[in-house]
């Protein structure tokens, strides 16, 4: 999935197996309808693991190589992102490409039973659209949300949903849809998707940092999630980024919660002298109003400070800055870089980061990527 199309020779070298062993394994997968042979594209090498140097195979010099790749239309999956106000859902193929439109339903009642009913409807909507387009019926559902999930099944902490007790969401959805269902942290899902199908492919380590309704962070090493029991409690949100910044609800002065929408709205209200929402701030920032622009620059410097802290401690190859409010980072990119440079050694390598456009469909796709990862084991 990560590197296809890829030759058997290259695959054998990556895995440290003999070509004979790889041929036997891939023959079984071809027979099972999981992968297929395809001509290798000329003059265009696909992504490979960082630092991997392919050894020359003189025995096959001059012969056209045949590549192997996952059969994209062999399976389909449904992915969903649960937000505080709505659920977004898409269907994807076996290589994580979105194959339907993004279906959205508003959450008017956040009780688990009502949310499951919405999930069932969205699963049906995505499945029907995929099947009408000739794709196979989805074989699994992946659902992501901001919170703490145990064993991919039970939601024990979901602050935006206000659930007062653990919810066995996986069991409830499986019973409602008849499909295997996994429940995942939303930030973890983004980083898994990036390492399977996106900018994290082949890298030794990769970070996703998000800000919007909250502040989130997830890290992979060698393509695998770095996990600990407490990681999804929003721990990155209370790292100091500005000693003169506003206090969060926990009383911390200048912690990373100042990057959240509510904190930005409160700070902007104080600056302009009357109550303002985050949407008011965003509108004024887009209109280049001086007071909003000043807060954009301050916010981006704070974000750069957080990025530098993460880069210095986790030492990732790349950081993806995402979230519904990540557009702010594009408005103040120079201040973001200044914040990074202020807390980065002058001789250290520049921090490699990217800021993709926000789209809830991509968050839903990321949940589907978790389902794919679970499906293939």
Language-model-detected regions and their locations in the chain:
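ATP-binding/phosphotransfer module of carbohydrate and carboxylate kinases, centering on a glycine-rich
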Residues: 1-103, 110-132, 136, 177, ...
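Short glycine-aspartate micro-motif
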Residues: 67, 77-81, 138-142, 206-210, ...
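Glycine-rich phosphate-binding loop and adjoining helix at the ATP-binding site
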Residues: 98-205, 331-342
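Glycine/GP-enriched mid-protein hinge/lid loop-to-helix segment characteristic of carbohydrate kinases
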Residues: 101-103, 110-115, 164-165, 169-283
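Short glycine-rich anion-binding loops that position phosphate/pyrophosphate groups of nucleotides
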Residues: 146-149, 212-214, 325-326
């Amino acid at each position: 999935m990560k590197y296809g199309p890829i030759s058997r020779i290259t695959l054998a070298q990556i895995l440290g197996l003999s070509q004979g062993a790889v041929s036997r394994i891939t023959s079984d997968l071809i027979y099972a309808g999981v992968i297929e042979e395809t001509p290798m594209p000329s003059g265009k090498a696909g992504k490979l693991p960082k630092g991997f140097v392919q050894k020359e195979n003189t025995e096959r010099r001059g012969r056209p190589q045949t590549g192997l790749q996952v059969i994209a239309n062999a399976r389909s999956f449904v992915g969903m992102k649960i937000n505080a106000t709505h659920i977004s859902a898409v269907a994807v193929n076996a290589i994580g490409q979105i194959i339907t439109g993004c279906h959205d339903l508003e959450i008017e009642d956040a009780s688990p039973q009502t949310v499951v009913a919405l999930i069932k409807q969205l699963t049906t909507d995505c499945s029907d659209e995929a099947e009408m387009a000739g794709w196979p019926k989805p074989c699994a559902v992946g659902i992501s949300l901001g919170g703490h999930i145990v064993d991919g099944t039970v939601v024990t902490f979901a602050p935006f949903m206000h659930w007062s007790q653990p919810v066995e969401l996986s069991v409830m959805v499986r019973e409602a849809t008849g499909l295997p269902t996994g429940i995942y942290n939303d930030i973890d899902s983004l980083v898994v998707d990036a390492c399977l199908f996106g900018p994290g492919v082949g890298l030794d380590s990769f970070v996703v940092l998000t800000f919007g309704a909250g502040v989130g962070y997830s890290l992979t090493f060698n393509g695998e999630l770095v996990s600990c029991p407490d990681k999804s409690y929003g721990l990155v949100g209370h790292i100091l980024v500005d000693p003169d910044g506003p206090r969060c609800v926990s009383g911390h002065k200048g912690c990373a919660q100042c990057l959240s929408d509510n904190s930005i709205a409160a700070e902007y209200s104080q600056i302009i002298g009357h109550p303002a929402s985050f949407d008011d701030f965003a509108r004024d920032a887009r209109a280049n109003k001086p007071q909003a622009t000043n807060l954009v620059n301050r916010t981006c410097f704070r974000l750069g400070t957080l990025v530098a802290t993460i880069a210095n401690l986790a030492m990732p190859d790349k950081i993806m800055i995402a979230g519904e409010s990540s557009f702010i980072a594009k408005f103040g990119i120079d201040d973001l870089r200044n914040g990074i440079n202020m807390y980065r050694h002058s001789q250290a390598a520049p921090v490699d980061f990217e800021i993709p456009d926000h789209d809830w469909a991509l968050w839903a796709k990321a949940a589907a990527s978790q389902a794919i990862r679970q499906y293939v084991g």
